[in-house]
């Protein structure tokens, strides 16, 4: 386990997030984007906002910083605002990952909340990507219910696609 492996894994995570946004979220009608779903965090919009807020919260804890303000209700339906906010959170994560060193993986930098103080950096890093995979799967199911033909998000296909690109 090393910092480069985590950077690679997060490149997969970011690529899958963008793929879902570009292929499926962008073409949704307002009604589809905000349609109430009786599962998990609700609508497609609410799932996306939850993903953004959770990633921001975890990486803020790792940095010892306060998370960004949540997306205000007045902007919660504004996809352009949400995308810009998500881009900002992703950029902060990329900056953290760029400075990540192997020895940091085995530190416990979180001060609050108390239950998170036992977590090593590597555990938080794995959790965030796993959490993203879980919610993308939920989103893909909901998008399928809305009539979209969705695609896989398996890590191994990301590897294959990037190996092929590197071999050319």
Where are these regions (language model features)?
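Short, contiguous alpha-helical
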Residues: 7-26, 30-72, 113-168
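Helix-adjacent hinge/juxtasegments
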Residues: 64-103
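Short alpha-helical interface patches
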Residues: 78-88, 104-105, 121-127, 158-162
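Acidic catalytic patch
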Residues: 98-114
